[in-house]
Amino acid sequence: MIVFSDMDGTLLTSDNQMSDATWAMLDELARRGIEFVPCTGRPLSGIFEPILAHPAVHYAVCANGASVWQLDDGTPTDTSRATRILSRPLDRAIAHRVHSIAAGHDVTFDIFADGQCFLPRSLYTRLDEFCGGDPHIAASLKRTRTPIDMDIDSKIDEVETLERIAMYWHDPADRDAIAAELDTLGGIEVTRSYAMNIEVMGEGATKGTALTWLCEHLGERLADAWAFGDNINDIPMLQAAGHGMAMINAEPEDREAADAITEYDNDHDGVARTIMAALA
């Protein structure tokens, strides 16, 4: 058995907390020697340190599968010491093209690179406008992003490994126009993790391809893999795992793609209850 789980809307409660039952599940997985792998759109630096420090956690799938990290054994919370063991980067020329598309619209522009997420300060200060009025989403975005004072194209050129791009919008017309232009580009994967965003990765970078690769790397059978998710970017891993579990609070597309649906939502220990029942 190996367990992969999305963070936001899945493992974490709606106010971005870890419940006692979820910690107890991780403790039981560690006791049994079962790997728990955060599988998230977040950068590595955006995963809560107590999760990275837990003895059940040695790997993390980040940026929607663009990077798979192995944590440092001695200091797992020091993300600068983690080793990237799989990389499916976004081509810089494509990233510049995506920026040129976005520049004509009122959207944010997140640069996920080198295990971090960078956002121009002028957009960072406006994040509340792009979160659909949800203060918990706004708080999460602010916590996982580093505001920068350099221009976007220069930052794209400066980073070592470009993982993905994210754009948050508040006018559906901007979403539709950007999506239409992205459809004309090759070499990318397009998805979303919230109703109000668009996420762009390099071709072949999905949570599903990362899950498949890590299972092979660790000698785990896909049939023994459990995956939990709630949004569109989770669908590839729900389809790849032998036990693809959509949260009961998941998008309809996830519930359609999954092998089963959890009995409880993310605010009522849906992941923990399902895994503990499977271990019983």
PLM ranges: what are they?
Residues 20-133:
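Active-site phosphate-binding/coordination module
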Residues 1-7, 24-27, 31, 220:
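Non-catalytic pre-domain segments flanking phosphatase-related domains
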Residues 53-56, 63-64, 185-186, 240-241, ...:
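Short, structured coil segments at secondary-structure junctions
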Residues 1-16, 98, 238:
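Asp-based phosphoryl-transfer active-site loop
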Residues 1-2, 18-19, 183, 198-280:
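Mg2+-dependent phosphoryl-transfer enzymes with acidic/Ser/Thr/Gly-rich catalytic loops
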Residues 105-108, 112-228:
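Conserved acidic, metal-coordinating active-site core of Asp-based
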Residues 16-32, 88-95, 148-153, 202-216:
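Short, acidic loop-to-helix structural element flanking the phosphoryl-transfer center
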Residues 7, 65, 229-231:
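Active-site metal-binding loops of divalent metal-dependent hydrolases
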